[in-house]
């Protein structure tokens, strides 16, 4: 007789793994899928993305009988913008929200749909982030400083991947998307690398595969926009990165790279740098922290590998590369202190990080190994940076 299995009480885990439907299609031909969400959609977008999608939206309205009024998310994915958009929803009474644009436009659209309990469709206009896929949104101040993130109850109902639209974006946006996506490995392996949870293990392994794809194919993709390799890298940055976040969920969080990004957004002069550019720099800072505090030689090797890769595709390696070479010591400290706030993801590192240690890492992303222990000793002695 088989042994009986005792029921085990487990906490309820809510997983938002993927959009309900993902289609690779020109936006103008996606009318049948949008019709399943309703006949009227409020289009949340910015001025540039509205221009890019204008003809497609006109075609959707003409050929599929959709009503698609426009609403701007500007000045940012901020509480004030969301308040204005909620009033617009009340006025228009749409059946669904249609987000068209980059990460902030899509985050705003997702949050608006979440707050108003409407269906949501996303149309990324670049491969700069995986925001079109995920059940997460970042909220900023009106001037672009990171404030907090919001976990949403589901991924978008529909994700439309229009490669022709994405190819019209400047190459810098894909480079930034590569930087944002490759962070999945360096952060997930630290935050969740020892987990035995099946989905978390799958997410971490997918992050490793994602890293390898980007290492192998990014340079060729950037040299041949529109090619099959280019599409593979777009898919990796836009879709596969989203899969990892969906599988790993709360157990597979960001760590220092995104925390450094959030800190940098507190500086107005950093706002011209793209999300993925700041995250890519943040990966180097995270690896430097592992070297400085733990003497981790694997981190040193990984940093050298990344520096070579960054040179190859044009990602920033230093504050100067981000246009922040002239920030004051006080501004650097302000950034570090925000990054080290008690609720920051930087504390997912397996050691304590102080603002002073972080400042040292931020200004030494190019330092050779032999200077690491000496630099950390100076920090410990409070003898300056």
UniProtKB/Swiss-Prot annotation:
EC number assigned by the record: 1.1.-.-
Secreted is among the record's keywords: no
Superkingdom of origin organism: Bacteria
Cofactor(s) for this UniProt protein: Zn(2+)
Cofactor note: Binds 1 zinc ion per subunit.
UniProtKB keywords: Metal-binding, Oxidoreductase, Zinc
GO function term, MF aspect, one: oxidoreductase activity, acting on CH-OH group of donors
Residues binding Zn(2+), per UniProt: 180, 258, 275
One Pfam family in the UniProt entry: Fe-ADH
Protein family (similarity comment): Belongs to the iron-containing alcohol dehydrogenase family.
Protein name (database record): Uncharacterized oxidoreductase slr1167
């Amino acid at each position: 007789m088989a042994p009986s299995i005792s029921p085990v009480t487990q906490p309820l885990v809510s997983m938002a793994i993927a959009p309900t439907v993902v289609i690779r299609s020109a936006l103008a031909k996606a009318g049948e899928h949008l019709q399943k969400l309703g006949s009227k959609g409020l289009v949340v977008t910015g001025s540039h993305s509205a221009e890019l999608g204008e003809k497609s939206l006109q075609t959707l309205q003409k050929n599929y009988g959709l009503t698609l009024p426009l609403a701007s998310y500007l000045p940012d994915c901020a509480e004030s913008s969301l308040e204005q958009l909620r009033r617009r929803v009340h006025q228009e009474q749409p059946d669904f929200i249609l987000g068209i644009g980059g990460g902030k436009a899509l985050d705003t659209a997702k949050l608006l749909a979440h707050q108003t309990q409407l269906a949501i469709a996303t149309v990324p206009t670049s491969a700069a982030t995986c925001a079109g896929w995920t059940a997460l949104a970042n909220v900023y101040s009106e001037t672009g400083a990171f404030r907090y993130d919001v976990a949403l109850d589901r991924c978008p109902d529909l994700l439309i991947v229009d490669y022709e639209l994405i190819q019209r974006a400047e190459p810098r946006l894909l480079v930034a998307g590569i930087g944002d996506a490759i962070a999945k490995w360096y952060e997930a392996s630290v935050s969740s690398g020892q987990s035995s949870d099946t989905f978390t293990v799958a997410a971490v392994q997918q992050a490793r595969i994602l890293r390898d794809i980007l290492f192998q194919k990014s340079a060729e993709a950037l040299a041949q926009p529109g090619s099959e390799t280019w599409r593979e890298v777009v898919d990796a940055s836009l879709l596969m990165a989203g899969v990892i976040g969906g599988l790993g969920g709360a157990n597979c969080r960001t760590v220092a790279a995104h925390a450094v990004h959030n800190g940098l957004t507190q500086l107005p002069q950093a706002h011209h740098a793209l999300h993925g550019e700041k995250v890519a720099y943040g990966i180097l800072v995270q690896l430097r922290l592992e070297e400085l505090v733990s003497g981790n030689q694997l981190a040193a090797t990984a940093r050298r590998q990344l520096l070579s890769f960054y040179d190859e595709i044009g990602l920033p390696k230093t504050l100067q590369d981000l246009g922040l070479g002239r920030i004051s010591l006080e501004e650097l400290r302000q950034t570090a202190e925000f990054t080290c706030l008690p609720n920051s993801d930087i504390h997912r590192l397996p050691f304590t990080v102080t603002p002073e240690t972080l400042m040292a890492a931020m200004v030494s992303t190019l330092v050779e190994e032999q200077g690491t222990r000496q630099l950390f000793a100076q920090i410990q002695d409070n003898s300056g940076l």
